[in-house]
Swiss-Prot record:
GO-annotated molecular function: rRNA binding; structural constituent of ribosome; tRNA binding
Top-level taxon: Bacteria
PROSITE patterns found in the cross-reference section: RIBOSOMAL_L1
Membrane-spanning residues: none
Pfam families in alphabetical order: Ribosomal_L1 (PF00687)
SUPFAM superfamilies documented for this protein: Ribosomal protein L1
PANTHER family: 54S RIBOSOMAL PROTEIN L1, MITOCHONDRIAL, LARGE RIBOSOMAL SUBUNIT PROTEIN UL1M
Subunit structure: Part of the 50S ribosomal subunit.
InterPro entries xref list: Ribosom_uL1_bac-type, Ribosomal_uL1, Ribosomal_uL1-like, Ribosomal_uL1/biogenesis, Ribosomal_uL1_3-a/b-sand, Ribosomal_uL1_CS
Keyword RNA-binding carried by entry: yes
UniProt-recorded name of the protein: Large ribosomal subunit protein uL1
Length: 234
């Protein structure tokens, strides 16, 4: 087994694996435990008390992070007529209809998010097998199938993220960049957690937020105290 580098060991020693932190101290600890030489992303994993095998316990949605994600994204909008101009005026990077669909069929995926007007979904659905696995399929539940394309583009540019519980009942989401600092990352985390609480399924029993961990891209996971988090999101 390969030995861990000194930087990795030193970083891991800054995290008390037996402790559960409050939000602010947890984020601060994760930032202190960095060792990579770049501005790492900061992410959170939240294990929910849901069984995603049941449709009524599938937690899926979106939220606009108040300080954004720190990542510049390219947005594609499937639209026709006046909605094309509306999307361009809002700052969309690629706007069109049939020609964009053909480009995607030919293997082009030079965008990070896709929005579609409802009248385009019949055509867009035909490339669903190409978009879906890449997380690029527009979806009404996340606000990316809409005639209000300007708002959809503005929200995405402002830092809107999508989240979805996985098969293990865990939601993984980005909170921003390490350079944001503890305060901004905490604001972003609270926005996400409050949305998760608001979306709690009526059929979910017992504790809802079972466990939480925050980490940088390369750093060690820092566990948060679910009870302290629950108090913070009220």
């Amino acid at each position: 087994m390969a030995k861990k580098g000194k930087k990795i060991v030193a970083a891991q020693q800054k995290v008390d694996a037996d402790r559960k932190y409050d939000i602010s101290e947890g984020i601060d600890t994760a930032l202190q435990a960095r060792f990579a030489g770049f501005d790492e992303s900061v992410d959170i994993a939240v294990r929910l008390g849901v069984d995603p095998r049941h449709a009524d316990q599938m937690v899926r949605g979106s939220v606009v992070l108040p300080h954004g994600t720190g990542k510049e994204i390219k947005i594609l909008v499937f639209a026709k007529g006046e909605k094309e101009k509306e999307a361009l005026d809002a700052g969309a990077d690629f706007v069109g209809n049939d020609e964009l669909i053909e480009d995607i069929k030919n293997g082009w995926f030079g965008f990070d998010k896709a929005v579609a007007t409802p009248d385009m979904m019949g055509a867009v659905g035909k490339i669903g097998k190409l978009l879906g696995p890449r997380g690029l399929m527009p979806n009404a539940k996340t606000g990316t199938v809409t005639f209000d394309v300007a708002r959809a583009v503005n929200d995405l540019k402002a830092g809107k993220i999508d989240f979805r519980v996985d098969k293990a009942g865990i939601v993984h989401a980005p909170l921003g960049k390490a350079s944001f600092g503890t305060e901004k990352l905490q604001d972003n985390m609270l926005a996400l957690l409050r949305m998760l609480v608001a979306m709690k399924p009526a059929t979910s029993k017992g504790a809802y937020m079972r466990s939480l961990a925050v980490s940088t891209s390369m750093g060690a996971g820092v566990r948060l105290d679910p009870l302290l988090v629950k108090d913070a999101v009220k």
